[in-house]
């Protein structure tokens, strides 16, 4: 399993415009590095890539050994998700992780809250400021 191209294309350019806008500054999609250049920083944090370092327990940056993995844990779409992957390839392949993974992050709770307000027709600027705009502030994205 892997992330879809539609999912990747849904991320805005850092200036807040969609990639299909001719003035967006979209670099292109010949290589993964091009696709994630100048995009919403959260995309770079989600998609596993050769340049993404892992931070290990002692705080030392380690090379991303997992980005070069092959076999069952490598994405068939070419867009591998960082979530639930471990930098140690042997542990990842064995499916014997001893780490406590987060299932719901606070960011997801905020997004669920905003979506519920949108579905109920009660989404106001105040709701956006308490949910989505809080997340956008963390990565210096423009407010909605």
What are the residue ranges of the model-derived segments?
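Acidic/polar-rich alpha-helix caps and helix-coil junctions
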Residues: 1-144
């Amino acid at each position: 399993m892997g992330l879809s191209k539609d999912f990747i294309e849904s991320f805005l350019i850092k200036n807040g415009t969609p990639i299909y806008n001719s003035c967006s500054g979209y670099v292109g999609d010949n290589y993964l590095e091009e696709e994630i250049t100048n995009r919403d920083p959260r995309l770079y944090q989600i998609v596993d890539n050769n340049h993404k370092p892992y931070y290990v327990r002692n705080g030392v940056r380690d090379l991303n050994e997992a980005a070069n993995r092959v076999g069952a844990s490598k994405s068939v779409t070419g867009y591998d998700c960082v979530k639930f992957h471990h930098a140690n390839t042997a542990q990842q392949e064995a499916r014997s992780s001893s780490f406590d993974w987060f299932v719901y992050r606070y960011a997801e709770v905020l997004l669920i809250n905003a979506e519920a307000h949108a579905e109920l027709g009660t989404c106001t600027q105040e709701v956006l400021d308490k949910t989505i705009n809080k997340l956008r502030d963390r990565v210096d994205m423009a407010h909605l």
